[in-house]
Amino acid sequence: MTISILGAGAWGTAIANSLSGKQNVILWTHNKTTFESISRTRESDKLLGCQIPENVSVKLAIKETVNASAMIFAVPTQSLRKVCQQLHDCNLKKDVAIILACKGIEKSTLKLPSEIVNEVLPNNPVAIFSGPSFAIEVAKKLPYSMVLACQDDTLGSKLISELQQENIKLHFSSDVVGVQICAALKNVFAIACGIVLGKKLGFNAHAALVTKSMNEVKTLYLAKTDSVSIDIDTLLGPACLGDLIMTCTSLNSRNLSFGFKIGSSNNSFDAQQTLSEGKSVIEGFSTAQSAFNLAEKLKIKMPICEAVYRLLYESASIEDTISVFVG
């Protein structure tokens, strides 16, 4: 089986390394400098010290990725629609499975990643690959556990069989929407938790904030799906609780580190400048705006997401923001 991975950032490169022992892997980047660097050194500047195996073929032209059996998308959510359109223009075959490893909500439409793919590539089956996974550990082939969410049980079982390895434990879920909501919101919550930790408000406040975060996941899920309950396996499994624990407790998390800098800066932190200077994508920054707008559209209250949004986009005071987190 040949798998194409779209996006050669830290996450995409890590997945390529992780799967290279069992699959033929194509790693695509739109960035010519990145392409030339990886081709020359077999190393990514996003994952220094991790050699990219020779059986990972690096490509610059997206048309060279379309003959794979499955495609894993590891691009920023805000770029997903553009990449899907490029594949559509390359006549991607309809039986090629799209596996989404990106997390977020599209700002312009307030759609989840699977909804974007269904619009642009309606004939391709979609699955979600999500859970607690730091890129550097995945690249080193350390053990990790993820959820593979798909509405087609047969396809889900097939993909798990192909992707699962000795160090990768995959759990099947049919809750495509719930898994994506957890994946998107946890980055916003990580920024909030980083602020609390940066302000040295203690682990009691931190734990309370993580607990409140799970309630906001539930609130958005119920409103978006018009359901009366959320799948408990989603809420307490790797995709939600597992990812929250990891992303909201370790400074290896880009989003937590971003929030920590805000909390420890004594109101002197320039979020926009930090984003423009950094090499990493802070998905929680974009998702805070998307989540706030989606909550407004659905007429629901999501106080943590709203507080992070108002701090980052409307210059709310850090004191007012923290009062929401610990109140």
Curated annotation (Swiss-Prot):
Q: Which SUPFAM superfamilies match?
A: 6-phosphogluconate dehydrogenase C-terminal domain-like, NAD(P)-binding Rossmann-fold domains
The protein's superkingdom reads: Bacteria
Task: Write down the chemical reaction(s) this protein catalyses.
Answer: sn-glycerol 3-phosphate + NAD(+) = dihydroxyacetone phosphate + NADH + H(+); sn-glycerol 3-phosphate + NADP(+) = dihydroxyacetone phosphate + NADPH + H(+)
Query: One GO biological process from the UniProt record?
Result: carbohydrate metabolic process
The annotated pathway is: Membrane lipid metabolism; glycerophospholipid metabolism
Annotated compartments: Cytoplasm
Q: Which Pfam families match?
A: NAD_Gly3P_dh_C, NAD_Gly3P_dh_N
Q: Which cysteines are joined by disulfide bonds?
A: none
- PROSITE patterns the record matches: NAD_G3PDH
What UniProt keywords apply to this chain's record, in alphabetical order?
A: Cytoplasm, Lipid biosynthesis, Lipid metabolism, NAD, NADP, Nucleotide-binding, Oxidoreductase, Phospholipid biosynthesis, Phospholipid metabolism
Q: Which residues bind NADPH?
A: W11, H30, K103, A135, R254, V281, E283
| EC top class, as a word | oxidoreductase
InterPro entries hit by this protein? 6-PGluconate_DH-like_C_sf, 6PGD_dom2, G3P_DH_NAD-dep, G3P_DH_NAD-dep_C, G3P_DH_NAD-dep_N, NAD(P)-bd_dom_sf
Query: Which GO cellular component terms are attached?
Result: cytosol
What molecular function terms (GO) are annotated for this protein?
A: glycerol-3-phosphate dehydrogenase [NAD(P)+] activity; NAD binding
Known EC number: 1.1.1.94
What residues bind sn-glycerol 3-phosphate, as annotated?
K103, G131, S133, K186, D243, S253, R254, N255
Q: Which residues form the active site?
A: K186 (proton acceptor)
What family does the entry list? Belongs to the NAD-dependent glycerol-3-phosphate dehydrogenase family.
Q: Report the function annotation for this chain.
A: Catalyzes the reduction of the glycolytic intermediate dihydroxyacetone phosphate (DHAP) to sn-glycerol 3-phosphate (G3P), the key precursor for phospholipid synthesis.
UniProt protein name: Glycerol-3-phosphate dehydrogenase [NAD(P)+]
| Protein source organism | Wolbachia sp. subsp. Brugia malayi (strain TRS)
Q: Which gene encodes it?
A: gpsA
